A protein has these predicted regions:
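A conserved acidic beta->alpha catalytic loop
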Residues: 22, 37-46, 65, 89
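Conserved nucleotide-sugar donor-binding catalytic segment
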Residues: 114, 132-210
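Glycine-rich, basic loop-to-helix element that forms the pyrophosphate-binding segment
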Residues: 63-80
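Short, well-formed alpha-helical segments that are part of the catalytic scaffolds
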Residues: 12-25
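Short loop->beta transition adjacent to catalytic acidic/histidine clusters or analogous donor-positioning motifs
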Residues: 1-3, 24-35, 43, 56-59
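Short aromatic/hydrophobic "clamp" motif used to bind/position activated sugar donors
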Residues: 85
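Conserved donor NDP-sugar-binding/catalytic core segment of glycosyltransferases
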Residues: 97-127
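Catalytic core of nucleotide-sugar-dependent glycosyltransferases
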Residues: 184, 192, 196-231, 248-259
């Protein structure tokens, strides 16, 4: 098998079919799809069995208890056989030639990340296509958490590093930080092949997001290369400001600016400070 697509899911009955189909309907056909149900209680496991149980390319597993998505992704890797490992969240989708183009861009790289620009709603309608500009410096992108979506991430099998199961959010960012610090080579491509679904149940917010961001901070603040530390600190500071932790947020922000004043020569960062630090509507 050339490619393994690993899809962790918890209570994702509403979207899992679209996700699996977007993996099965790729122009690249030598694919196995591994679904790991994390002890859902909404009938997701039974639904996937009914819809895909007779599809040879789809392998369906169920955790004996809720183990969180890092465990599920790691388990999926352990039972996979592909030369290339792709991850897809249960609520996201890919355009039809995503896998094909990703494999073409591996070359001597260990990880290929495809910048997601299309965001869809619960019905699959396009909400927006991002025109955000990204730095060409891969390390800057990683340490400032501008790349992290698992659905946009693919590994060569022999270079895969396990997700940290001590994190129940920000595990994707933490993994990329480890990847850079361990010397893995990352290719970032901007081809708009990954579609991120926005909906009420998406777990990219809440207090857990803040707490796990702070966990990354304390785990890695002394390991980040000096020239990239301001970008790391800025991201943590804007997260603190976002959640109303103004004193701590401003202290960290000022530290980042002191280390590298040029970090403010970026309209997005200025906008973030105005919005979160001063509560200005922009």
């Amino acid at each position: 098998m050339k490619v393994s697509v690993i899809i962790p899911v918890y209570n994702g009955k509403s979207y899992i079919k679209q996700s699996i189909n977007s993996a099965l309907n790729q122009t690249f056909k030598d694919v196995e799809v591994i679904v790991i149900d994390d002890f859902s209680n909404d009938g997701t496991y039974e639904y996937v069995l009914n819809e895909f149980g007779n599809v040879g390319k789809v392998k369906i597993f169920r955790n004996e208890k809720n183990m969180e998505r890092s465990y599920s992704r790691n388990f999926g890797f352990n039972v996979s056989s592909g030369e290339y490992i792709f991850f897809l969240d249960y609520d996201d989708e890919w355009k039809a030639n995503y896998i094909e183009e990703t494999i073409e861009n591996f070359n001597n790289f260990d990880i290929v990340y495809s910048i997601p620009r299309t965001f869809i709603d619960k019905n699959g309608n396009v909400l927006r296509v991002s025109k955000r500009k990204y730095s060409k410096d891969i390390n800057e992108l990683v340490f400032s958490a501008q790349i992290a979506y698992p659905s946009a991430t693919a590994f060569k099998r022999e270079k895969f590093i396990y997700f940290n199961e001590n994190y129940n959010q920000r595990e994707d960012w933490e993994l990329f930080i480890r990847a850079v610090l361990s010397g893995l080579k990352i290719n970032v491509i901007d081809n708009n092949k990954v579609m991120i679904r926005e909906h009420d149940k998406r777990t990219s917010g809440g207090l857990s997001f803040l707490n796990n961001t702070l966990k990354v901070y304390f785990d890695y603040k002394n390991k980040i290369p000096k020239n990239y530390l301001p970008f790391f600190l800025f991201h943590v500071s804007e997260t603190l400001l976002r959640y109303g932790k103004l004193k701590d947020g401003w202290l960290l922000l000022l530290k980042a600016i002191k280390l590298n004043p040029r970090i403010l020569l970026n309209s997005r960062r200025i906008g973030s400070i105005l919005k979160r630090g001063f509560r200005v509507r922009i």
